[in-house]
Design a protein with these regions (language model features):
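Cleavable N-terminal export/targeting peptides
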Residues: 1-29, 179-181
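Repeated loop/turn-to-beta-strand initiation elements of outer-membrane beta-barrel proteins
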Residues: 33, 63-69, 97-99, 147-155, ...
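Extracellular loop and loop/strand-boundary signature of outer-membrane beta-barrel proteins
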Residues: 40-43, 74-76, 126-131, 158-159
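Gram-negative (and chloroplast) outer-membrane scaffold detector with strong preference
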Residues: 58-123, 136, 163, 172-173, ...
Length: 181
């Protein structure tokens, strides 16, 4: 909860301190390559909330269609940590040269979990700790809005639903490396 509030305050400060757009008369081109850092929260099932951090690179294949491989590190506690690698496809609903760009995104990938389970034996009541590790598939779909703070720097809140995790809410901070000039 504190992480989410700190993140919101940080994004607000950046938005207020950064000039919003360059000169209005300047013609922008569509983005070609973007990189972003991802911060947020994910929920597995009904109550297993994880904090997440990661990164992604988006490459445009047409004016509005792009592919985006991403990596996320998710952590609930020292006894529950996940690594997620997913290939996404994104579509910009609005003109990608504008200040606000609404998009849909979805993809599939793999999630690897490592953790520890502790308890006591049912019969002997002897305590035990077991290391666990498993890999499973993941899929998610959702949408977001890129808000350009400058010609190239943007923030984008994003919400996704899926399998492993069930719900994912993130704030992305990104930069356009090719295009928008």
């Amino acid at each position: 909860m504190i992480f989410s509030k700190s993140l919101a305050v940080g994004v607000f400060v950046v938005a207020c301190a950064t000039p919003l757009c360059a000169q209005q008369g300047q013609q922008l081109t569509r983005p070609k390559v973007e990189g972003k850092v991802i911060f947020g929260s994910a929920v597995f099932g009904e109550d297993l909330e994880h904090t997440l951090v990661g990164g992604a690179v988006r490459a445009y294949v047409t004016k509005r269609l792009s592919i985006e491989p991403e990596y996320l590190y998710l952590r609930r506690s020292k006894d529950d940590q996940d690594h997620l690698v997913q290939m996404n496809v994104a579509y910009d609903f609005t003109d990608p040269t504008k200040r606000f760009v609404a998009y849909a995104i979805g993809g599939a990938g793999v999630l690897h979990n490592r953790g520890r389970v502790s308890g006591s034996d049912f019969v002997t009541r002897a305590p035990f700790v077991r290391e666990i590790s498993f890999t499973t598939w993941t899929v998610s779909a959702g949408g977001g809005v890129k808000i350009f703070l400058t010609d190239r720097l943007f923030v984008s809140p994003e919400l996704r639903l899926g399998r492993e995790p069930t719900v994912r809410a993130t704030i992305n901070v990104g930069y356009v490396f090719g295009g928008r000039r």
